[in-house]
């Protein structure tokens, strides 16, 4: 389960989101306005393309997050798990209803089930 402290950090900051393509090539993007629901991270997809394509071949993903004041005291975590992309249903409806997404055309919800959390050392 994702702790309350990590949940706050995740929901208040941009995250790096890494996927792996068909030929094993890594791809990393920044995502924001994500939500933590239990042991899952829910990402709203308004513009994500290559990462979605990569998930068709490999569902293993990694996210990284750190605090905004990292230059004073760096606190960060890597969150690894498996991702699924939803273009309809409960998770799609959930992200479409989020106030942060008002005015955006949401294409899908990416739901990452977190299997491992690692504290990053600075």
Model-predicted regions and their roles:
Residues 1-122:
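Binding-site signature for planar aromatic cofactors or substrates
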């Amino acid at each position: 389960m994702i702790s309350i402290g990590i949940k706050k950090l995740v929901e208040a900051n941009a995250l790096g989101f890494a996927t792996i393509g068909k030929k094993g090539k890594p791809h990393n993007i920044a995502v924001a306005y994500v939500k933590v629901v239990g042991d899952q991270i829910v990402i709203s997809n308004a513009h994500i393309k290559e990462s979605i394509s990569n998930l068709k071949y490999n569902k293993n993903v990694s996210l990284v997050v750190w605090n905004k004041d990292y230059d004073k005291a760096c606190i960060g975590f890597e969150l690894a798990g498996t991702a699924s992309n939803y273009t309809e249903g409960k998770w799609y409806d959930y992200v479409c209803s989020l106030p942060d997404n008002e005015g955006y055309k949401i294409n899908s919800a990416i739901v990452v089930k977190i299997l491992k959390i690692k504290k990053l050392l600075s």
